[in-house]
Amino acid sequence: MLSAFQLEKNRLTRLEVEESQSLIDAVWVDLVEPDDDERLRVQSELGQSLATRPELEDIEASARFFEDEDGLHIHSFFFFEDAEDHAGNSTVAFTIRDGRLFTLRERELPAFRLYRMRARSQAMVDGNAYELLLDLFETKIEQLADEIENIYSDLEKLSRVIMEGHQGDEYDEALSTLAELEDIGWKVRLCLMDTQRALNFLVRKARLPGGQLEQAREILRDIESLLPHNESLFQKVNFLMQAAMGFINIEQNRIIKIFSVVSVVFLPPTLVASSYGMNFEFMPELKWSFGYPGAIIFMILAGLAPYLYFKRKNWL
């Protein structure tokens, strides 16, 4: 899908590209999974070649942040959650050339959707491609900050479930959610660090206007403040995971202790029963009239003795 926006009194307005309106006035050209015709149109009208899928997936720094005859290129991760609430990072290719911003992505992303909604009512300050790029990065960081807050809130709920130590379906679900939150936190951290690298490259390589230079530095400060919070999430997740494993081990030890006590309690009666169950011709007790009840009483006493001993030692 191809979308294009122009500036009117420092406000973004959408160009009707479906009606064959020229892209020449566009300050922002946004492409989501473009087909060959859309790629060809951008190439023919604006002379801009677009990154291929393998180039988007390349993770080397030299392939993600560079400058060539086609402009300044930045490939950056954006966080998203799919329809099944599975978290992921999707690469967006940014290119700035001749005062125009090109964005190429493989899916619709929350940060882009939120920025377009804001742009309808908010005017830009300087109205240039760099401000557009930084506004998108700013929106991304806000989204990541919200995601960190959501993880904190979820961890508080999980903490109460885990610390109660009552194992069951709710406990199993808490452990599964804990692993999922750890994965989300890792993806958020990757996105923050990638954005930090992208902004450092932009500050070094691009001749940013004064307003955008300060905006970039402000976003970098926001990232610096979020990274420790993100790190503390991993520590909290690790603590809760260890606590959960500790409670599980305690419960398992309790079960094993019960089996151990049962086996020890039944061992002496079993010894008595096996002794009198031996098939020998000369066994004096076989001729006793009270031999059988006496053996039963002896077996009961042999079982009670270790049980009472364990009870006295507080092993039960």
Swiss-Prot record:
Changing residue 279 to A/L/Q: Reduces magnesium transport by about 99%. It is a multi-pass membrane protein. The record marks 253 as: Essential for ion permeation. It holds the Pfam family CorA. Changing residue 278 to A/C/I: Reduces magnesium transport by about 99%. The keyword Magnesium applies. It is found in: Cell inner membrane. Belongs to the CorA metal ion transporter (MIT) (TC 1.A.35) family. Homopentamer. In the absence of Mg(2+), interactions between subunits are weakened, and dimers, trimers and tetramers can be observed in vitro. Homotetramer. This is Magnesium transport protein CorA. It comes from Salmonella typhimurium (strain LT2 / SGSC1412 / ATCC 700720).
